[in-house]
């Protein structure tokens, strides 16, 4: 089963558009774990087990593991998700972007070392920096398009005078991803929940691509508005929430608190679908 089929199946099975982002910060762990980077796996695995039946995807952010020398814990976590939640696709949030030869190594890292079902990428260096990931048939690749951070305007909202119609950069990227770059049907786009009008614009330019929508919760994005802007019956959307769920509770039952928050978020997203 390819990534998109896995995503559709998990969305239908769990009645969910919610993705839980796994961004572990040991300083924010509950008592007994707080400040201990050796507990990254334990913390994340507990959240995964508490929410696996409520989500359409999980999204571990590689920097939160690498910063603590916890890549081995990430490998173990990926194996745990494959064993305990095999029906839920895993998106490795890596935002890689490099020349072809180096991209081949990053692709190997994402899909062979970690066994991810999809990966996030920066498309700034063009198609040849993306192609090595697409060599892994059945895997997904989400390209940064209109990101949730304010600084995204510096480049993404600039007009391209040399392109017919003078589209904004993010608009041009959406068109490329929907068209000539999507040779094997593996691409999706990252569009921040903080910009619902831009989500709607991206959806009009890329009507069939999966959209990964971060920026809900701590970043202030409107989850319901994001769903209304991006949802189509024939194209999946994934609404990511990380810190709001991970750190919903600071006590011994932090996983239970994470589940309760995930239930609330799932219900909010479901209500917006109607």
From Swiss-Prot:
Q: Which reaction does it catalyse?
A: orotidine 5'-phosphate + H(+) = UMP + CO2
Q: Which organism is it from?
A: Verminephrobacter eiseniae (strain EF01-2)
Any single biological process term in GO: 'de novo' UMP biosynthetic process
Please verify whether the record's keywords include Lyase: yes
**Record bears the keyword Lyase:** yes
Q: What is its EC number?
A: 4.1.1.23
- Can you say what this protein is called? Orotidine 5'-phosphate decarboxylase
Which keywords does this Swiss-Prot/TrEMBL entry list?
Decarboxylase, Lyase, Pyrimidine biosynthesis
A single Pfam family it belongs to is OMPdecase
**Upper lineage ranks?**
Bacteria, Pseudomonadati, Pseudomonadota, Betaproteobacteria, Burkholderiales
Q: Please give the Gene Ontology molecular function terms for this protein.
A: orotidine-5'-phosphate decarboxylase activity
Q: Which NCBIfam families does the record cross-reference, listed alphabetically? A: pyrF_sub2
The pathway to which it is assigned is: Pyrimidine metabolism; UMP biosynthesis via de novo pathway; UMP from orotate: step 2/2
Give the protein family: Belongs to the OMP decarboxylase family. Type 2 subfamily.
Q: Where is the active site?
A: 95 (proton donor)
């Amino acid at each position: 089963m390819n990534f998109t089929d896995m995503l559709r199946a998990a969305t239908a099975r769990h009645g969910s558009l919610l993705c839980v982002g796994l961004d572990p910060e040991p300083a924010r762990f509950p008592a007994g774990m707080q400040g201990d980077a050796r507990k990254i796996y334990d913390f994340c695995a507990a959240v995964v087990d508490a929410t696996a039946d409520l989500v359409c995807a999980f999204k571990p952010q590689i920097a939160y593991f690498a910063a603590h020398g916890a890549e081995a814990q990430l490998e173990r976590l990926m194996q745990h998700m494959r064993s305990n939640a095999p029906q839920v696709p895993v998106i490795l949030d890596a935002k890689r972007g490099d020349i072809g030869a180096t991209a081949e190594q990053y692709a190997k890292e994402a899909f062979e070392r970690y066994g991810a079902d999809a990966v996030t990428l920066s498309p700034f260096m063009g198609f040849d920096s993306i192609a090595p990931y697409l060599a892994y048939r059945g895997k997904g690749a989400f390209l940064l398009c209109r990101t949730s951070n304010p600084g995204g305007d510096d480049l993404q909202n600039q007009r391209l005078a040399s392109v017919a119609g003078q589209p904004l950069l993010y608009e041009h990227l959406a068109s490329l991803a929907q068209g000539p770059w999507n040779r094997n049907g593996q691409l999706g786009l990252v569009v921040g929940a903080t910009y619902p009008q831009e989500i709607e614009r991206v959806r009009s330019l890329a009507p069939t691509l999966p959209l990964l929508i971060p920026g809900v919760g701590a970043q202030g994005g409107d989850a319901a508005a994001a769903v209304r802007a991006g949802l189509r019956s024939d194209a999946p959307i994934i609404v990511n929430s990380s810190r709001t769920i991970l750190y919903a509770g600071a006590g011994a039952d932090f996983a239970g608190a994470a589940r309760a928050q995930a239930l609330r978020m799932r219900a909010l997203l479901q209500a917006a679908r109607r």
